[in-house]
Amino acid sequence: MRKLLTTFVCVWFTLAVWAGDGIYEKLQQIPQISEIQKLDVKPFQEYYQFWFEQPVDHSDPAKGTFRQRVLLGHKQSDAPVIVELEGYNIWSSEEGELANILKGNQLTIEHRFFDQSVPEGGIPWENLTIKQAADD
């Protein structure tokens, strides 16, 4: 998760600096992101579901990749970013409690190998470890 979180922190700082372009265009420029879908979720000004490509095994990238589901709710570039890490699945696309209280943007990440964030061809259970999840 640390690599994914680091990537998204960098994305958010970049988003705050890039004036004029929409979030959609900015997300399209990140090579690991695919299938960006705009959704209408209030109170966010922009809201997207997309997939982030991750290695199945961070210690052996030759084992292939899987797509991890991510939801991004954007209110404004100078708002804090609340990161929600979801196990089992993403239960709701609604604004979370902290995003509501802090009037923040929200990044919701589905845990590896749960719900829609699974490799094609089955789950290699030996790669569902705390270390692998932390490396995501």
Enumerate the predicted regions with their spans.
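Active-site-proximal flexible loops/turns
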Residues: V9, S93, D115-S117
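Glycine- and acidic
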Residues: P119-E126
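Bacterial Sec-dependent N-terminal signal peptides
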Residues: M1-G22
